[in-house]
Design a protein with these regions (language model features):
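ATP-dependent helicase/translocase motor core
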Residues: 2-253
Length: 253
């Protein structure tokens, strides 16, 4: 894993094999809307077909465009967290954009709705400013988390500090993907030893918090036999159920 490419690949493989994710196609990303329209459409058709049909009866062949554009408008005005929790309106229909974990598994319908969430890991998409984040995690077509990954054992020798610099200098905080609250809500700077996070990109003023477990009463993470020290980020924190819980219960902006 002594290169950033293989580090990135290993994280993707973990998320898509045991983490409950689907591998995303960067070509499916629409930089104008900062959405994955195909996933938006697939999720709504799968979980809210009756509402889709009602909108279709009014919009016909423009149904997909109308729904996706109304979603983009809601995200721009209400913010991603509000839309995930409260939904958005389109042609008089209240559309949900996420189904969170039920308190009990007794209700089969609610469990099926929860299982229908489309969670994807997409590498190397291109934004409208031709930025190429290492990895973007999305829920039902809405990008929510970005990761910049560095491997200090690679030829470049870049580490988590370089990832933080990349967020500060090379990511447009006013761009569609990165603008505060409107799409992505968490940004992780990661290497094989440490993780830092922020919820708001603000150029040189971006403030990162450590997202480490600590080691010997100090910073960092304990060594892990057969894996890198930061593996908990993708095997625990970002695994499907934990990912959903972050946006259902724990995030406040």
């Amino acid at each position: 894993m002594h290169s950033e490419y293989y580090f990135e690949q290993a994280i993707e493989q973990s998320l898509t094999t045991v983490g409950g994710y689907v591998k995303g196609n960067p070509k499916d990303y629409d930089p104008r809307l900062a959405l994955f329209p195909k996933d938006v459409v697939a999720f709504i058709q799968e979980t809210q077909l009756k509402k889709w049909v009602k909108i279709y009866n009014s919009c016909k062949d423009e149904t997909e465009n109308r729904i996706v554009n109304d979603l983009a408008h809601a995200l721009d005005t209400e913010g991603a967290l509000s839309v995930l929790r409260q939904g958005f309106k389109c042609f008089g229909q209240k559309i949900k954009m996420a189904y969170f974990a039920p308190n009990t598994s007794i209700n089969k319908t609610i469990q099926e709705q929860y299982d229908a969430n489309i969670i994807k890991c997409t590498r190397q998409l291109h934004t409208e400013f031709n930025e190429i984040p290492d990895m973007v995690l999305s829920l039902n077509g809405i990008p929510l988390i970005t990761l910049e990954l560095k491997n200090e054992f690679s030829a470049s020798g870049w580490n988590v500090e370089d990832a933080k610099i990349q967020f500060k200098k090379d990511r447009n905080a006013k761009g569609r993907l990165f603008e505060f609250k409107k799409r992505t809500l968490v940004h992780f700077a990661v290497d094989t030893c440490e993780v830092y996070m922020t919820t708001k990109l603000d150029g040189e003023n971006t403030f990162f918090l450590p997202f480490n477990k600590g080691y010997l009463n100090g910073r960092g993470n304990p060594p892990v036999e057969g894996d890198v020290r930061t593996h908990y980020l993708w095997t625990e924190t970002l695994a499907r159920h934990s990912f959903m819980e972050i946006f259902a219960r724990y995030m406040h902006l």
